[in-house]
Regions:
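Left-handed beta-helix
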Residues: 1-7, 200, 204-399
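Unchanged
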Residues: 1-257, 364, 382, 387-388, ...
């Protein structure tokens, strides 16, 4: 049997501006998820378990934290002598200035190096979703369909606002039309931002669009042109898929992991999520602690009450403090008597004594950026956002 030469490109350069202070100073794929992991781990673990040996990560916005986490691909067994892991960093050249304006633009900027790899199939996926998917199934279906492109789609639950997605109309295994972020969606089937391409067909469309002066995101012009050619296949994903691109989705998507029958497992023995994580000591639960549906990462120290929440590495929750329906990132401190509800607190922040954040039944969570100090007795109502301390403030030691 002829071996298929497949290349997986993980798009990890997104800013994630809808997440407000949580992505100030870092790319969205570097955000923590489930306490121990980062969003990019999901895509890389899918690639590793799918036996894809050549995986490239395309970076752009704030790449430093993400680059450190990627550790040369070692946590995903991609640090190979031949092939394996590669980071595609942003660059300027004779044909391109500034940064890429979208996913399709990012592909055309990096096309020379992709083309030199000469893949039979180019699999492109985003790095900011919860998804378990064997990419080998996608590649096999793509080749069987002799398609120029294959869109991995899923049907969203009734009542979901799909206006921020690529809405897909398909039948008989073929995509008939796509509508990118429509104001009035006509269905609930959306693209999961996983695609397989025939490289020659993709290159032709990218060249034409680049010559015409506009690429942007894949759904704006690239996919509509491919669909118009009639050779785009639909691969229906029936499992769990969760976009974590808004504050509410980022919080609720993680709290779903705490259910007894969670729709997504980070610790599935057959498909574990792999990550790069420094060695830290075990979590400590003090005598005064009360826990109900709590995920505790290493080195957490809990003496207060935790309900339906994810507690990141090194987090300290003092006696008398309450944390409910929230996500606390690395090394957050919640002082005695403080109450945190429906909130996402970024790493290194300190919640002062008797401070009150959020409300248990609020739709919009409180967002606190990294290394902030919330004063004692402060009140932050639902939907409040605090930007991180700026780097120069950290250097000066100001508050």
């Amino acid at each position: 049997m002829t071996r298929v030469r497949a290349l997986c490109v993980v798009l990890a350069g997104g800013r994630g501006s809808r997440l407000g202070p949580l992505t100030t100073g870092r790319a969205k794929p570097s955000l923590p998820v489930g306490g121990n992991y980062r969003l990019v781990d999901i895509a890389l673990s899918n690639a590793t378990h799918s036996a894809l040996t050549d995986v490239w990560v395309l970076q752009q916005y704030e790449p430093h934290l993400l680059g450190e986490h990627l550790a040369g691909g070692r946590p995903w067994d991609l640090d190979r002598t031949r092939g394996g892991f590669r980071i595609l960093a942003p660059f300027q050249g004779p044909e391109h200035d500034g940064f890429a304006s979208g996913n399709a633009d990012a592909l055309v900027r990096n096309w020379p190096v992709i083309d030199s790899f000469d893949p039979d199939v180019l699999l492109v996926c985003s790095a900011d979703h919860l998804l378990t998917l064997d990419f080998r199934d996608v590649i096999a279906a793509h080749l069987d369909a002799a398609a120029d492109a294959t869109v991995v789609s899923t049907v969203m639950p009734a009542g979901t606002d799909v206006s921020r997605y690529l809405v897909v109309q398909a039948d008989g295994g073929r995509v008939r039309s796509v509508d990118y972020k429509p104001e009035s969606p006509t269905g609930r089937c959306v693209g999961t931002e996983v695609f397989a391409y025939r490289p020659a067909a993709l290159a032709e469309q990218l060249r034409d669009l680049h010559r015409d002066g506009g690429l942007g995101d894949y759904g704006e012009r690239l996919l509509p042109r491919l669909v118009a050619g009639g050779a785009v296949a639909d691969f229906r994903h029936d499992g769990h898929w969760r976009d974590l691109g808004t504050p509410t989705a980022y919080l609720d998507g993680q709290l779903e992991l705490l259910r007894e029958r969670s729709p997504f497992r980070l610790d599935d023995p057959a498909w574990p999520i792999l990550t790069s994580m420094p060695v830290r000591g075990p979590a400590i639960v003090r005598r005064t602690a009360s826990l109900d549906r709590a995920a505790l990462a290493p080195a957490a120290d809990v003496a207060g009450e935790v309900v339906n929440s994810i507690v990141g590495p090194g987090v300290v929750i003092e006696r008398g403090a309450q944390v409910r329906h929230s996500v606390l990132m690395d090394d957050v401190v919640v002082r005695a008597g403080a109450s945190v509800a429906r909130s996402v607190i970024a790493e290194g922040s300190v919640i002062g004594r008797r401070a009150m954040l959020g409300a248990p039944n609020a739709v919009h969570p409180v967002l606190v950026g990294s290394h902030r100090r919330v004063a004692a007795d402060a009140i932050l109502p639902a939907g409040s956002e605090l930007e991180p301390r700026r780097p120069r403030d950290l250097i000066r030691g100001t508050r």
